[in-house]
């Protein structure tokens, strides 16, 4: 699943030549909490939230929104073709409510809200972990399924101290749902960190074998 599959396309977007009053009216109309500030080509230049707008004096309502926005350097972003797990990890790490979605050339094309991610994850909770590993396998190149399971056994030993064979690990993930795996790992972030670690170990072991064979 990609970030584009989670994003809200009906988002509030404020242009650099608009005023504070314009921003307030747009957020009210769209019923949104935050919005990106963009240039005429829809490239991100800043960010503003309702809480920040509430702190602005009425005498400043006609001033440019750019005087009150957060600069682009402080804005957490994701790309539309990023894996969905990347945005989940950013929500966990940075404790933000929403994140703008960019194209690779910097245009804002959507927003991902943490509430949307939660709804999507809720639908995924009954999916077997086996399917998530199959998706990982499809994305990490010329690693065989057996090599991925070997890496999973290595990472399990490293992280928990449990000795488990690759075959036993495969049987376990066939019987375990995404929801149960999150609970067993101690949270969503730890689950994805472990998953990423397995992929990295699989690639490292593959590279080591090639070097040894060469």
UniProtKB/Swiss-Prot annotation:
Keywords: CBS domain, Repeat. The keyword Repeat applies. Pfam families: CBS. It comes from the Archaea. Residues 7-65, 69-129 form the CBS domain. InterPro entries: CBS_dom (IPR000644), CBS_dom_sf (IPR046342), Diverse_CBS-Domain (IPR051257), UCP006591_CBS (IPR016486). PROSITE patterns: CBS. PANTHER family: CBS DOMAIN-CONTAINING PROTEIN, CBS DOMAIN-CONTAINING PROTEIN CBSX3, MITOCHONDRIAL. This is Uncharacterized protein MJ1004. It comes from Methanocaldococcus jannaschii (strain ATCC 43067 / DSM 2661 / JAL-1 / JCM 10045 / NBRC 100440).
């Amino acid at each position: 699943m990609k970030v584009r599959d989670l994003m809200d396309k009906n988002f509030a977007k404020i242009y650099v030549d608009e005023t504070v009053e314009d921003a307030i009216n747009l957020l009210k109309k769209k019923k949104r909490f935050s919005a990106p500030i963009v240039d005429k080509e829809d490239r991100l230049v800043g960010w503003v939230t309702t809480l920040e707008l509430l702190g602005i004096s009425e005498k400043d309502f006609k001033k440019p929104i750019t005087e009150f926005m957060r600069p682009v350097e402080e804005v957490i972003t994701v790309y539309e073709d990023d894996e969905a797990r990347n945005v989940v990890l950013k929500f966990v790490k940075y404790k933000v409510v929403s994140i703008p979605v960019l194209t690779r050339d910097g245009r804002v094309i959507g927003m991902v809200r943490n509430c949307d991610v939660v709804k999507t994850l809720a639908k995924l909770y009954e999916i077997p972990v086996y399917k998530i590993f199959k998706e990982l396998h499809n994305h990490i190149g010329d690693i065989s399924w057996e090599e991925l399971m070997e890496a999973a056994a290595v990472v399990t030993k490293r992280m928990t101290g449990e000795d488990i064979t690759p075959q036993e690990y495969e049987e376990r993930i066939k019987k375990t749902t995404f929801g149960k795996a999150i609970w067993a790992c101690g949270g969503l972030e730890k689950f994805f960190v472990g998953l990423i670690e397995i992929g990295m170990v699989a690639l490292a072991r593959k590279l080591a074998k090639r070097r040894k064979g060469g």
